[in-house]
Amino acid sequence: MLVYIAGSGAMGCRFGYQISKTNNDVILLDNWEDHINAIKENGLVVTGDVEETVKLPIMKPTEATQEADLIILFTKAMQLPQMLQDIKGIIGKETKVLCLLNGLGHEDVIRQYIPEHNILMGVTVWTAGLEGPGRAHLQGVGALNLQSMDPNNQDAGHQVADLLNKANLNATYDENVVPNIWRKACVNGTMNSTCALLDCTIGELFASEDGLKMVKEIIHEFVIVGQAEGVELNEEEITQYVMDTSVRAAHHYPSMHQDLVQNHRLTEIDFINGAVNTKGEKLGINTPYCRMITELVHAKEAVLNIQ
């Protein structure tokens, strides 16, 4: 199969690297010039659990011409519409497009560009880091769940899960992936934005009495909005999942902290807490915590003059 990685940041590099170890062709797509040049000149340098340099083709999305068998979307949420526009030429009748982006509502965007028949939605707990252009740090283990959006095309989902398992990516075909997507979004909604605003680690947030109270209110808002949309969510179970995750990740600054505080980049807040607030408004459900957090993050972006 010919597999394109659409958005070759840290996670894209992880998936591209691991899939390249199977009998499948991988092409990385990205728009970051320094990253593209580094990989073209020196290969992708992998550190962490393995130390290796691999030669992988990389190009801008608009430069890709060969029809894809599989495209895995790892672009930033706000760049998704442009990416989908740029890759339209490599999507054939049977091309599978797997979305593994963090956050909520991406399927609505994808449907504007790609038929339901071709769309797979998923969620992953793999992690990865970039140490600079062309350098990926891959440590630890993870897994992912995915599902075909077209109930009459579940074979496509099983084929993709098999391919990813050959790459040791621990994929499971999930008959109902949406609750897992919401659960992961809730983890991000409780930790990412709050730690970015408070300039703290996940452990520091959860050690604070007021921080913990805020976390539980955010979880409640995610659950009531998700349930109103028909998603099967259990507040007690999700609260426990968030708490367990906070213990494992206690010493980490989450990705939004890296974006906002460390690197002064725009965040994906509109697709996490902001998405819950927007959905809540449409459903007539008040979500004051998600609304305030979204406004605070946007205010911080403005204060830092992030464009």
Swiss-Prot record:
<dbReference type="GO" id="GO:0050661">
    <property type="term" value="F:NADP binding"/>
</dbReference>
<keyword id="KW-0566">Pantothenate biosynthesis</keyword>
<feature type="binding site">
    <location>
        <position position="102"/>
    </location>
    <ligand>
        <name>NADP(+)</name>
    </ligand>
</feature>
<dbReference type="GO" id="GO:0005737">
    <property type="term" value="C:cytoplasm"/>
</dbReference>
<keyword id="KW-0963">Cytoplasm</keyword>
<feature type="binding site">
    <location>
        <position position="268"/>
    </location>
    <ligand>
        <name>NADP(+)</name>
    </ligand>
</feature>
<dbReference type="Pfam" id="PF02558">
    <property type="entry name" value="ApbA"/>
</dbReference>
<dbReference type="InterPro" id="IPR013328">
    <property type="entry name" value="6PGD_dom2"/>
</dbReference>
<feature type="binding site">
    <location>
        <position position="188"/>
    </location>
    <ligand>
        <name>substrate</name>
    </ligand>
</feature>
<feature type="binding site">
    <location>
        <position position="192"/>
    </location>
    <ligand>
        <name>substrate</name>
    </ligand>
</feature>
<dbReference type="InterPro" id="IPR050838">
    <property type="entry name" value="Ketopantoate_reductase"/>
</dbReference>
<dbReference type="InterPro" id="IPR003710">
    <property type="entry name" value="ApbA"/>
</dbReference>
<comment type="similarity">
    <text>Belongs to the ketopantoate reductase family.</text>
</comment>
<dbReference type="GO" id="GO:0008677">
    <property type="term" value="F:2-dehydropantoate 2-reductase activity"/>
</dbReference>
<keyword id="KW-0521">NADP</keyword>
<dbReference type="Pfam" id="PF08546">
    <property type="entry name" value="ApbA_C"/>
</dbReference>
<dbReference type="InterPro" id="IPR013752">
    <property type="entry name" value="KPA_reductase"/>
</dbReference>
<comment type="pathway">
    <text>Cofactor biosynthesis; (R)-pantothenate biosynthesis; (R)-pantoate from 3-methyl-2-oxobutanoate: step 2/2.</text>
</comment>
<dbReference type="InterPro" id="IPR013332">
    <property type="entry name" value="KPR_N"/>
</dbReference>
<feature type="active site" description="Proton donor">
    <location>
        <position position="184"/>
    </location>
</feature>
<dbReference type="InterPro" id="IPR008927">
    <property type="entry name" value="6-PGluconate_DH-like_C_sf"/>
</dbReference>
<dbReference type="InterPro" id="IPR036291">
    <property type="entry name" value="NAD(P)-bd_dom_sf"/>
</dbReference>
<feature type="binding site">
    <location>
        <position position="128"/>
    </location>
    <ligand>
        <name>NADP(+)</name>
    </ligand>
</feature>
<dbReference type="GO" id="GO:0015940">
    <property type="term" value="P:pantothenate biosynthetic process"/>
</dbReference>
<keyword id="KW-0560">Oxidoreductase</keyword>
<feature type="binding site">
    <location>
        <position position="255"/>
    </location>
    <ligand>
        <name>substrate</name>
    </ligand>
</feature>
<comment type="function">
    <text>Catalyzes the NADPH-dependent reduction of ketopantoate into pantoic acid.</text>
</comment>
<feature type="binding site">
    <location>
        <position position="102"/>
    </location>
    <ligand>
        <name>substrate</name>
    </ligand>
</feature>
<feature type="binding site">
    <location>
        <begin position="7"/>
        <end position="12"/>
    </location>
    <ligand>
        <name>NADP(+)</name>
    </ligand>
</feature>
<protein>
    <recommendedName>
        <fullName>2-dehydropantoate 2-reductase</fullName>
        <ecNumber>1.1.1.169</ecNumber>
    </recommendedName>
</protein>
